[in-house]
C-alpha cells in the first residue's frame, strides 16, 4: 500500500505567519489531538469529535477584528469533504500514470477533477487515460487556459434576449442553481446576433468561470466541497421552432464539449412546465438511461413551486419560478448572476493567492488515512462587473479595472498518511500563519452508505452523458424527430413495414431480451439517434431541393392553359358586347314605351275635345 500512496507522504503546510518564521515540524503521528489544538490555538479552531459514521462540522473564521489589507489578513477555513479510501487509491494510481506519461499539467493536478473523469469511465484506468489525454489536447487546441484573456463576448446582452439562461443563487446544500427558459429561445434570432463559433467559445468561457470561480466560492460559503450544480429547465412553449438544423448542430457540439471535458458536474435537474407532449418525451428517453441517472432528473408539470422550494430557499429562487427574488436593482434575475461568487469577502479569499491547506482524515474498518492537500493556484481573469461593487472591502482586493486577475485555489491534490495496526506512514507538517482549509474525510460513513465493492457503479457511461443542459435538448430533439417520422410513416403506407421494423427495436420484448449491459444501452441509444438524425437530414435535403427547383409547367399543359386564357378573354369580350347590345335594347324599349305613352295621351285629349 505504501507504493500506491507515496504521493500522500508529501509535507503539508498548515499556515504562514506574518514574519514567515518556520516553526518546528512535527508529524501527525507524533502529535496528539490536544497538542494540535494547543498548536493552532491562535486560529481559534473548534474541533468536535465525531463518530466514524458521521460527518464532521466545520466553521469558517476570520482572524483579527481590525481591517487590514488582504496581504496582512489571515483566514482559517474548514471544508467538509467525504472521501472513499478506494477512490483515493484509484485517483493516486491514475495520477501516477499521468505523471509518468507527462499528462498532468499543474492546473489540473486536482483530486476531484481526476475523480470526476474516473467516475465518467467507471474507474477504467485505460479509458479514463484516453479521455484525459483527449481533454488535454482539446484544451491546447481550443486555447482554454487563456480564454479569459483572449476572448470577450460583447454580444452577451443581445444573446440573453433570445436565449434566457444563467446562474441564480444556490440551493439549500450550497450548490449553484443554473436556470434555462428553453421555451423562450429563438435560434434564428440568436444566430443573427452571434455565430456558432463565438457562442461555443462563450460557452467554454462560462464553464471555466464556473469551475474555477463559482464552485470554489460555493465551497467557501457552504463550508463543504461542491463540484456540481442544480439545474432548472423551463420547457414551457418548446416546439419545432426550437429544433432547427443550426440549433441541432450547435447542441451536438456543446454536448460533446461538456461530456468530454467537464464530466460529472450535474447533481440534479428539474424539468418544469412539461406538458403531456414532454411527458411522452421523458417516457421514451428514460428507457435508454441508467436507473440512478433517472433519479437525478425530475420531470414536473406546472405545479412545481412546492418541489423547488423544498430544494431551494425562496430568497434564492426567482419570482417567475415561485420564489421571492426579483433582482430589480440588477435588471432581473436572469441578468443578476446572483451567488456567493459575488461576495466581496469570499472573493478576497479566492484572490489572496495564499496556499489553502486541506488536512484530511479517512477512517474505515482497516486503517486510518490522514491526508493533507496542498492545492495549486491558477490565475483567472474575470470580467464580472458585479464584483466591483464593494466599497472599502473591495478596495483592498480589486483593481479599478473591470478585468482583473483572480487567484483561484485548486482545492485538492492529496498528500496522505496511512495509520494502521501493522504499518504507518507519518506525514510531516510545517506550520505557517496563512489561509488554511481543514478537511476531515470519514470513509466509514461512506462505507456504511454503500459497499466498497460497488464503487463507481452508480456512475455508468449513460450517467456520464447526462451532465449538461445541452443533453436535454438532444432528448427533446429525438422526441420531435421520432414523432415527425411516425407521422410521415403513417401517411406513406408503402413504408409501413420499414417503420414497424424500426419501432420494434424499442418494444417490450426487445428490451426484455436485451442484455443488462450499460455499454449495449449506450450503443443502442447512439444507433437510434444517429439513424433518426440521418433520416431527418435526408428529409431536409429533399425539402431544400424542392424549394430550389423552379416551378415549371409542361409545354402541353402550358398551351392548354394559354388557350383557356385566350378563350376566357374572348368570352369576356363577347359578354361585354352582349351587355352593350342589351343596354341599347333597353334604352330603345324605354323610348318606345315613352312614345306609346305620348300617343295615348294625345288620343285621350282629342276625344275629350270632340265631346265638348
Swiss-Prot record:
Domain CRAL-TRIO residues, every copy: 155-329
CDD domains, per the entry: SEC14
Residues forming coiled coils: 555-588
Keywords on record: Cell membrane, Coiled coil, Golgi apparatus, Membrane, Protein transport, Transport
Compartment annotation: Golgi apparatus membrane; Cell membrane
GO cellular component, one term: plasma membrane
InterPro entries: CRAL-TRIO_dom (IPR001251), CRAL-TRIO_dom_sf (IPR036865), CRAL/TRIO_N_dom (IPR011074), CRAL/TRIO_N_dom_sf (IPR036273), PI/PC_transfer (IPR051026)
Record's bilayer topology term: Peripheral membrane protein
Chain positions covered by the region annotation Disordered: 16-36, 379-400, 498-518
Family: Belongs to the SFH family.
Purpose of the protein: Required for transport of secretory proteins from the Golgi complex. Catalyzes the transfer of phosphatidylinositol and phosphatidylcholine between membranes in vitro.
Designated name of the protein: Phosphatidylinositol/phosphatidylcholine transfer protein SFH5
GN (gene name): SFH5
